[in-house]
């Protein structure tokens, strides 16, 4: 039985089949086409298939659906393998390639031809659409080639394989039901001609099986019991079952569908994502603004937060739109516990402590992670000198109402160090403040003033002599429209790109303990958010997520 913590309509179906003895082993699969990078929507399919197999002590396969050679390639195969490894979704049932079944798919196609259940058609794509009618009431009519004899069809199909015909000149269609209200059952194409080299098979083949034909065959060969896929394939289920019944004569594999994961301000279409990459609108498939798993990984997302988000978004049969802020909130909750604290000044201005010795340097112990565990008292040493960097936004000559940080004559605490009072500023020829002067109360090291006076604000700082220079990239949503699935059909999705999806800050100042930080490390930059070193560009930090948001889990 399914774990109560992972119970949904899919586990109800599986529980019933197990109880009736219809299956002994729960065997699932994740079948990505290697023509693009996996995204957050793919993570839902991985999570469902992997977790269901794991909960029932079953098997989980990874199968590359490489039956359409036009855009497929090894680059995508390797990225998919990396993504599953990152997610710790181990395919304990094995790793397979749909192209390894080409010979068997071909043999099954010949079987259907011999049984009078498939025929070679000469109609063009446009003519076929006309003949098939539509689901709005236009009836279909049979192709003039529908009644070819099995012998003639077999000869033509073998000549298709031999390369005698051009792309689109002929197709192999299943002979099912032209009167069906389901368009997928009106003699669907199951083989087409494509004189395109395959990334694994080379030029061995010039005919390729359609997904709806190859997929159920592959499932049956691998012993899949539950073929779990997204809701767009619901109308394809009768064809899936037709293939299984006519070629294998059994009930299983069983296809069932779940709703896709849609996230606000995001597109999931590979076509759209590819266009963003190919037109250099983004910095590759792993741009931190992209919804791809490689982009989320580069952004700093954790694999555990991805699966937690997918689980909390729910598994149902009804499409819904999940707020991106829920995805961020899940990650933020994890990072709040696990990310080490560090100090970084993103938009620096110099603070000079006039009464502090120029040749002196002392070290303050700052906590690494005060929120992780009450017993976690680990600290690191941070250098303090006469000249410091503070945030430009932490000082105002003429402060706005309720401003609690540094102004002329006011006093603040330098986090973990001294109280300082602003005494003046230096300006350039344009009147811009280039340095702030202050005096420290040197009796307040790590403590409160003896006279008990209250200080309203605390600001962070980095020593000018002991810091690292960095570029910081602050990310926002990639699209301005919340529901990108609702834009008009004739609209250009690129018109909805957010012009402010990234803000680049040059010259940020980081505490020197970050010199050994590497991609994959995650830090809370105190008061500024969560950040990680970029995996492509040295000296660049990506903001993973902000410190706070109004969204509540």
Protein language model regions, located:
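A glycine-rich helix N-cap at a beta->alpha junction
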Residues: 76-103, 108-109, 116-119
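Secondary-structure transition/capping motifs at alpha-helix termini
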Residues: 19-22, 51-59, 85-92, 220, ...
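Intrinsically disordered or highly flexible coil/loop and linker segments, enriched in small
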Residues: 23, 118, 166, 183, ...
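Long, charged, mostly alpha-helical binding arms that flank functional sites
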Residues: 253-330, 334
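Substrate/cofactor-recognition hotspot
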Residues: 309-319, 324-553
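Active-site cores that bind ATP or allylic diphosphates and position pyrophosphate for catalysis
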Residues: 66-68, 74, 111-273, 331, ...
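N-terminal catalytic cores of NTP/NDP-binding nucleotidyl/phosphoryl-transfer enzymes
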Residues: 6-15, 19-81, 197-230
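Conserved short loop/turn motifs at secondary-structure junctions
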Residues: 31-35, 63-71, 94-103, 126-127, ...
């Amino acid at each position: 039985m399914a774990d109560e913590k992972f119970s949904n309509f899919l586990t109800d179906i599986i529980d019933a089949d197990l109880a009736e003895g219809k299956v002994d082993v729960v065997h699932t699969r994740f079948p990505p086409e290697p023509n693009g990078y996996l995204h957050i929507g793919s993570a839902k399919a991985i999570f469902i298939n992997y977790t269901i197999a794991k909960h029932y002590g079953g098997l989980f396969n990874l199968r590359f659906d490489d039956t359409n050679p036009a855009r497929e390639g090894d680059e995508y195969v390797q990225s998919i393998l990396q993504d599953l490894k990152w997610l710790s979704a181990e395919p304990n049932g094995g790793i397979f390639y749909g192209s390894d079944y080409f010979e068997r798919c071909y043999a099954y196609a010949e079987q259907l031809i011999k049984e009078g259940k498939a025929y070679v058609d000469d109609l063009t794509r446009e003519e076929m659409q006309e003949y098939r009618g539509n689901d709005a009431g236009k009836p279909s009519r049979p192709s003039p080639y529908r009644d070819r004899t099995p012998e003639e069809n077999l000869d033509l199909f073998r000549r298709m394989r031999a390369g005698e015909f051009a792309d689109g000149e002929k197709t192999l269609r299943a002979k099912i039901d032209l009167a069906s209200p389901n368009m997928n059952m009106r003699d669907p194409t199951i083989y087409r001609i494509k004189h395109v080299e395959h990334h694994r098979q080379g030029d061995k083949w010039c005919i390729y099986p359609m997904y709806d034909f190859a997929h159920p065959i592959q499932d049956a060969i691998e012993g899949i019991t539950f073929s779990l896929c997204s809701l767009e394939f619901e109308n394809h289920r009768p064809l899936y079952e037709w293939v299984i019944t006519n070629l294998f004569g059994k009930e299983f594999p069983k296809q069932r569908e779940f709703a896709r994961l849609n996230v606000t301000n995001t597109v999931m279409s590979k076509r759209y994502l590819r266009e963003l990459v190919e037109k250099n609108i983004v910095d590759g498939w792993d741009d931190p603004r992209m919804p791809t798993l490689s982009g989320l990984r580069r952004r700093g997302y954790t694999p555990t937060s991805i699966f937690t988000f997918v689980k909390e978004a729910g598994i149902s049969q009804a499409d819904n739109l999940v707020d991106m802020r829920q995805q961020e909130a899940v990650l933020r909750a994890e990072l709040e516990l696990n990310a080490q604290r560090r100090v970084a000044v993103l938009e620096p201005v110099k603070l000079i402590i006039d009464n502090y010795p120029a040749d002196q340097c002392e070290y303050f112990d700052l906590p690494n992670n005060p929120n992780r565990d009450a017993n976690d008292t680990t600290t690191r040493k941070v250098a303090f000198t006469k000249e410091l960097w503070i945030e430009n936004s932490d000082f105002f000559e003429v402060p706005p109402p309720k401003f609690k940080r540094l102004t002329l004559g006011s006093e603040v605490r330098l986090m973990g160090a001294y109280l300082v009072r602003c005494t003046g500023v230096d300006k350039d020829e344009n009147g811009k403040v280039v340095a702030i002067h202050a005096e420290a109360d040197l009796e307040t090291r790590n403590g409160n003033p003896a006279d008990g006076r209250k200080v309203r604000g605390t600001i962070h700082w980095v020593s000018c002599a002991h810091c690292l220079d960095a570029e910081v990239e602050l990310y926002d949503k990639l699209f301005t429209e919340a529901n990108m699935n609702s834009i008009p059909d004739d609209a250009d999705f690129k018109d909805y790109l957010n012009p402010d999806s990234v803000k680049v800050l040059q010259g940020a100042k980081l505490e020197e303990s970050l010199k050994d930080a590497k991609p994959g490390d995650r830090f809370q930059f105190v008061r500024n958010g969560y950040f990680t070193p970029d995996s492509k560009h040295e000296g660049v930090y990506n903001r993973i997520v902000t410190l706070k948001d109004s969204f509540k889990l």
